[in-house]
Regions:
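Catalytic domains of riboflavin
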Residues: 1-369
Length: 369
């Protein structure tokens, strides 16, 4: 069964219909049933609970979460894919126990009302809000972001009710199961990768702002600068040689770490590609790119790492959500540069959502002294 186009899915979404979205096989490898939150009813909640069987959640933008006064469920998110649960919610009025389909639909309506504020909800409750990353699927290739993106693209409030699809035996539904589900219920099915493609055809969260030659001790690179539209940060790409989409390119996506790249702190491990080591490797082969991403580490976090250097070698510890943001940003830059296949300078890792950017890691090269 071929996937439906994102344009067709958006049209169904505009009409208040449900959609199925499948994520990367290297990520959760699951499908979620999504519905514009503005179109949520007791009947649709009942259908989700009965047919999809997963946890019914509400995707909201960061701005909307702030307006409702929603705090994260835990201060430090340790989930594998950094799904940003807030404390669960209930409508402040118009509900009984809160768990019925009608009560949950009422809670969704109260939360997504354009004039909603903290007084309109209570906590905890039976609806689980998920905070989407700014930039949507271009920043994080998850169902949370996809739900907000689809609703926005369809002209609704950027919020969706979503639920994972499970099989009768309680196992997660994979693509063959999801195709059967879609046919049975007449629901269109697509992929997050295609949604990324769709958005990239008209928009970016990083834009190229400059280019010049840059002489270094390792030779002359082309220095290309990019501005991050989300946080105003500046990212750089240092390119040597001619990059071609069908030819594997030596690539390092590198987040500046002052202790390692400026002071020379010695970190051990296969991911210990310093900026200078990566540039040297690219120069030795004569072709490749080192993408240098802005470091969002706070001054306090940096100071806390200094005493640790005398205890044991440590990696620059970034949150999983930050890593996913970096993957999305780096992927957009690589696509802009014309890279298709990557010989990645770093340990073997699976990066979610790369297929949406037409990127494929064909080789991983660990650091060796």
């Amino acid at each position: 069964m071929p996937f439906n186009s994102i344009a067709d899915i958006i049209e169904d979404y505009r009409q208040g219909k449900m959609a199925l979205l499948v994520d990367d096989e290297d990520r959760e490898n699951e499908g979620d049933l999504l519905l514009p939150a503005a179109c949520c009813t007791a009947e649709t909640i009942s259908f989700m609970a009965r047919e999809a069987r997963g946890l019914i959640c509400l995707t909201l933008t960061d701005e909307h979460c702030q307006r409702l006064g929603l705090e994260q469920m835990v201060p430090s998110n340790g989930s594998v894919f950094s799904t940003a649960f807030t404390v669960s919610i209930e409508a402040a009025s118009g509900v009984t126990t809160g768990i019925s389909a009608a009560d949950r639909a009422r809670t969704v309506a109260a939360a997504v009302d354009v004039n909603a504020g903290p007084a309109d909800i209570v906590q905890p409750g039976h609806i689980f809000p998920l905070r989407a990353k700014d930039g949507g699927v271009l920043t994080r290739a998850g169902h949370t972001e996809a739900g907000c993106d689809l609703a926005r693209l369809a002209g609704h409030t950027p919020a969706s009710v979503i639920v994972e699809v499970m099989n009768d035996d309680g196992t997660m539904a994979r693509r063959p199961d999801l195709e059967i589900f879609a046919r049975k219920h007449g629901i269109k099915i697509g992929t997050i990768a295609d949604l990324i493609h769709y958005r990239l055809s008209t928009e970016r969260t990083v834009v190229r702002i400059g280019e010049r030659d840059l002489p270094t001790v390792h030779g002359t690179f082309r220095l290309i600068t990019f501005e991050d539209r989300i946080d105003g940060g500046v990212h750089m790409a240092m390119v040597m040689g001619q990059l071609r989409r069908d030819t594997p390119a030596l690539v390092r996506v590198h987040v500046i770490d002052p202790l390692r790249d400026l002071v020379g702190a010695d970190y051990s491990g296969p991911s210990n590609w310093t900026l200078w080591a990566a540039l040297q490797r690219v120069a030795a082969e004569g072709c490749g790119v080192v993408v240098v991403l802005a470091n969002h580490e706070s001054s306090q976090a940096l100071l806390e790492r200094v005493p640790q250097l005398t205890q044991a070698p440590r990696q620059f510890n970034r949150s999983q959500s930050r890593i996913y943001s970096e993957v999305g940003t780096g992927a957009q830059i690589l696509q802009d540069l014309g890279v298709g296949k990557l010989r990645h300078l770093g340990p073997p890792l699976k990066y979610a959502g790369l297929t949406g950017y037409d990127l494929e890691v064909v080789e991983s090269i660990p650091f060796t002294e």
